[in-house]
């Protein structure tokens, strides 16, 4: 993370020596939200918004969460309803369902967002092949609601079959 244009230029000059392509993003202060959808637009089996906690923080003003943080369990999920208003959660769900429909995503998807202190929602990315395990977002959701993980996976497969038969 660079904190000035000069610092960014210096960093870019160094990176250009090793990489032919670079992605530069503006850092947005806020909370990391993820919306996990399982199913299809006629019936979502799972439709849940989670927040990511890192070093006991929900709101980030300069931190960058890396893959290693997730792999080494330095992050935790919490239910969005424990920190965000119902209207913000419903807006995230609506944006996610609209994006899934627009992008023709089927069966499973995870959309990531940054939510500012003013409740502005910024779309970060769509993950059309999110990790499915009992320690991933889906596992957290199942544990929270005391759902049987195998039953949810069976519903996931049923959703795929129903879509295939419909298409």
Predicted segments, located by residue:
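Phosphate-binding site of ATP-dependent enzymes
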Residues: 3-87, 122
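ATP-dependent carboxylate activation and anion-phosphoryl transfer catalytic cores
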Residues: 85-167
């Amino acid at each position: 993370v660079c904190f000035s244009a000069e610092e960014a230029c210096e960093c870019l000059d160094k990176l250009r020596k090793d990489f032919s392509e670079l992605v530069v993003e503006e850092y947005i202060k806020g909370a990391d939200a993820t919306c996990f959808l399982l199913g299809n637009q006629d019936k979502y089996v799972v439709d849940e918004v989670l927040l990511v906690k890192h070093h006991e923080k929900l709101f980030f003003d300069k931190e960058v969460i890396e893959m290693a943080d997730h792999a080494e369990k330095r992050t935790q999920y919490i239910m969005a309803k424990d920190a965000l208003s119902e209207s913000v959660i419903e807006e995230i769900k609506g944006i996610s369902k609209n994006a899934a429909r627009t992008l023709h995503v089927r069966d499973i998807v995870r959309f990531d967002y940054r939510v500012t202190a003013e409740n502005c929602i910024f779309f970060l990315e769509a993950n059309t092949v999110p990790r499915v395990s009992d320690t991933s977002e889906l596992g957290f959701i199942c544990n929270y609601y005391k759902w049987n993980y195998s039953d949810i996976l069976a519903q996931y497969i049923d959703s795929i079959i129903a879509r295939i038969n419909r298409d």
